[in-house]
Structure formats: C-alpha cells, structure tokens
Amino acid sequence: GAFTLGLPSTGIHSNGYSLVRRIISDNHLNLKETYEGFDKPLGEVVLTPTKLYPKLVLPVLKGADVKGLVHITGGGFYDNIPRVLPEGTRAVLDADKWPLLPIFSFI
C-alpha cells in the first residue's frame, strides 16, 4: 500500500497571519511579552520565518513513486488532502503521531 508523509511546520506561515493578528488583537495580547511555553516574545514567535521544503522534498521525488503532493493551507488536512486522492481512496491520519507546536496551542 501507499503511505502518507508529513513535513513539520515551523509555525505560523503566510496564510495564517490574518487570523493570528485578529486573535492577538481580540485577546489584547502583548507582542513584546514572553508567555508561558515560549522562550522568546510572542512577536518573535509568530514571525518565525516560513520554512521552505525543497531540500527535503526533491530527494523523495527522485527516489520514490510519489502519487501526489499537497500544500496544507486554509482548510487544513480535511479540505486539501482529498484534492490529490484518486476517487475511492482515503488518507488515514493519526493526529497523535505528530507534535503540536506551542504557538498553535496558545492561539
């Protein structure tokens, strides 16, 4: 059978900033404050640079029979993964298998 490979997020990426700005504003959060669970101020946490993945993905594309790739953006797993699956197939994901970055629990 086939398997699903996920690459880790480094934090809030470009499509998430509008929502994060609203959450910060609505909750009167201080971007200069270091909140529990972080080792730097919130402003630095949310501005962690977006990781680019070519160095990880290109060797996989060259060495495996890749059936599909999906960029998880707005809509998350549930809206994005089905777009690359052949009709009649499904992906089974176990959310307990990957760590949740503190910023996502915080917001």
Across the structure, where does each feature detected by a protein language model lie?
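Phosphate/diphosphate-binding glycine-rich loops and adjacent basic-rich segments that engage nucleotide
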Residues: G1-E33
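Glycine-/charge-enriched secondary-structure boundary and capping motifs
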Residues: N30-I107
